Amino acid sequence: ALGPLLAILATIFLVPRIKHDKEAAHTPTTHVLDFRPVLRCRAAMAYVLGYTVHNFELFAFRAWTVAFLVYAASLDDDINLPISIIMLAAIVNLFGVPASILGNEFALKLGRHRWITLIMLTSSVLACMIGFSTAWSIWLVIGLCCLYSMTITADSAALTAGAVEAAPPGYLGATMAVHSSIAFTGSFLGPLVFGIMLDVNSS
């Protein structure tokens, strides 16, 4: 719970102040709540839609990690876990935090499009593997989930940075509003669709 407070203090005292060139600053050509320039910007919307898919996958995984690990553990006769499944699920999700930060650093070195494509393809392969991994050792399943947690989030910062970079001049705030509003619809739909698929295919 102290995270936001620490972030505010870090921003105030640690982030250097930047002097903006008023002459170079862009002002919107329409009113502040006009999102049409953003919606017409194909480059920015590509990142927005990519982030939507990212959130769909991320929140589906987070919402169902505990249930999945409980099911996988129930199939392992030799299971001897030192901590609870809930704690394991929390640890699995924590692997994604540094992956998001480091992912953008790799994107800067390798190229943003190349990095995002590589991570999304890798994440898709891991998702398919994990879906069929429940009969394996629970420790192997947990290891795959940790790796999957990292690949899910490794493109997060790169997608947001890409949207910022591609924002139409004067519409950075509007671009971020569209970015968040549309993308977090995917956050709502991911767990919902996952649950529906379980119900549809349950025996």
Name the predicted role of every residue range.
Residues 1-13:
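Symmetry-related core transmembrane helices of the 12-TM Major Facilitator Superfamily/SLC fold
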Residues 154-167:
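Intracellular juxtamembrane helix-capping segments at the cytosolic ends
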Residues 108-121:
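Cytoplasmic membrane-interface "Motif A"-like loop-to-helix N-cap segments
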Residues 18-49:
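Juxtamembrane intracellular "pre-TM" segments in multi-pass secondary transporters
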Residues 121-135:
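C-terminal ends and interior cores of transmembrane alpha-helices
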Residues 43-97, 190:
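Extracytoplasmic gate region of multi-pass secondary transporters
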Residues 69-70, 106-107, 193-202:
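Interfacial helix-cap and linker-helix signal at transmembrane-aqueous boundaries
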Residues 164-200:
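A late C-terminal transmembrane helix in Major Facilitator Superfamily
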